[in-house]
Amino acid sequence: MKTIIVFLSLLVLATKFGDAKEGVNQKQKKEVTQNEFREEYLNEMAAMSLVQQLEAIERALFENEAGRNSRQKRCLGENVPCGDNIPCCGKLSCEKTFGYPWWYKSPYCVKPSSG
């Protein structure tokens, strides 16, 4: 209980005397407001405006590209059933497998034979 009282009293003292540098803070605020209207600040603001414009143009370009369905459609991998409605990937071909016809009821995506 005594430690809590000590910490609470320290907290009260810190909040009471913590803003002893209020005059310094007022000077810093005044300097900041004066610096806002310097040429460097205006140049920096112009650069930020340019960056925002470029980001808006980039966003518009990517929206148009996404609207054109420019991405390749998903396709199946190797050893996966395929058919007329389900295509294989570019380098694979849809072939009917041999052996166990009761097991393999549809053609599968396989690597084309080189022979």
UniProtKB/Swiss-Prot annotation:
Comment, domains: The presence of a 'disulfide through disulfide knot' structurally defines this protein as a knottin.
UniProt similarity note: Belongs to the neurotoxin 14 (magi-1) family. 03 (ICK-30-40) subfamily.
Cystine crosslinks: C75-C89, C82-C94, C88-C109
Tissues where this protein is expressed: Expressed by the venom gland.
Main subcellular localisation: secreted
InterPro entries: Toxin_22 (IPR012627)
Compartment(s) where it occurs, according to its Swiss-Prot or TrEMBL record: Secreted
Native source species: Trittame loki
Designated name of the protein: U17-barytoxin-Tl1c
Keywords, sorted A to Z: Cleavage on pair of basic residues, Disulfide bond, Ion channel impairing toxin, Knottin, Secreted, Signal, Toxin
One GO MF term: toxin activity
GO terms for cellular component: extracellular region
Signal sequence coordinates: 1-20
Reported function: Ion channel inhibitor.
Propeptide: 21-74
A Pfam family that the UniProt record links to this protein: Toxin_22
